[in-house]
């Protein structure tokens, strides 16, 4: 019975191909927070009106929420990748906990329930993000390839 001969040395993987231009990457970096902010703003406005009629104040609330969310998300995406892995995870934890808590508070639930739910979401986010950054970055926060 024949067997495949071992290869010489260790097989190496080449770099991941980059099929998009730098301009496309820049547009994606800007479009992601804007689109996500619009979805978040619509969701917050829908939670706030509780199925009632759409009013001008509700639209204003949704757009202001969308702008603030998009700006904060853009800041987190810009700043967080420069931080050490522990602080990087804490930054995403705070962002996700606050964002979820704000959305949940618009539904009319009690503030204690909103805080408890947002702390639970933040705890799960911290566990997932810390694991991800701990296994994919070195101690200085640089990606391991």
Model segments located where?
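Alpha-helical transmembrane segments of multipass membrane proteins
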Residues: 41-46, 75, 98-106, 127
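Structural signature of hydrophobic alpha-helical transmembrane segments
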Residues: 56-68, 87-91, 116-119
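Membrane-water interface at the C-terminal end of transmembrane alpha helices
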Residues: 123-145
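Canonical alpha-helical transmembrane segments
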Residues: 44, 65-81
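Membrane-helix boundary connector in multi-pass membrane proteins
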Residues: 98-117, 134
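Hydrophobic alpha-helical transmembrane segments
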Residues: 1-13, 34-39, 58-71
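Membrane-helix boundary elements
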Residues: 18-58
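Loop-to-transmembrane helix junctions at the membrane interface
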Residues: 75-97
């Amino acid at each position: 019975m024949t067997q495949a001969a071992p290869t010489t040395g260790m097989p190496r993987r080449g770099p991941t191909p980059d099929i998009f231009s730098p301009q496309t990457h820049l547009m994606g970096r800007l479009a992601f927070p804007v689109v996500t902010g619009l979805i978040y703003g619509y969701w917050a406005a829908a939670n706030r009106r509780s199925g009632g009629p759409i009013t001008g104040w509700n639209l204003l609330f949704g757009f202001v929420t969308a702008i603030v969310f998009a700006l904060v998300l853009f800041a987190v995406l810009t700043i967080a990748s420069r931080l050490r892995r522990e602080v990087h995870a804490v930054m995403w934890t705070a962002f996700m906990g606050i964002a979820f808590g704000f959305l949940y508070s618009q539904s009319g639930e009690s503030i204690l329930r909103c805080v408890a739910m947002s702390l639970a979401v933040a705890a799960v986010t911290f566990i997932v993000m810390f694991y991800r950054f701990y296994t994919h970055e070195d101690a200085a926060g640089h990606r391991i390839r």
